[in-house]
Amino acid sequence: MDFQKEPGRIFAVQDGTLIAEITFPEQDGVAVFDHTFVDGSLRGRGVADQLVRAAVRQVRGRGGKARLVCSYARSWFANHPEEADLLER
């Protein structure tokens, strides 16, 4: 899937409609993973996983840390302990 990237946001639009998005605005130097959305037509295709991975790359690229508010992001990080060093302590 082709994602558009902005600071603190990665998303996909199809025919003018938002179909996938993760938001992780920076607060006090920490990326707050606060929302993940995938359109029902895309569920089960690994799109949310792709969004979190792209966000992780973006946060790592700027040397940041992450705080998890979004339940999907919490679950994703629990299943990917190799990324735990990114989490705010």
Feature-to-residue mapping (PLM):
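Short loop/turn motifs at secondary-structure junctions and domain boundaries
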Residues: 2-3
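Conserved beta-hairpin
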Residues: 8-19
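Conserved beta-strand in the GNAT
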Residues: 17-25, 32
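A short, internal acetyl-CoA/4′-phosphopantetheine-binding micro-motif in the GNAT/acyltransferase core
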Residues: 36-43
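Conserved acetyl-CoA-binding loop-helix of GNAT-fold acetyltransferases
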Residues: 44-56
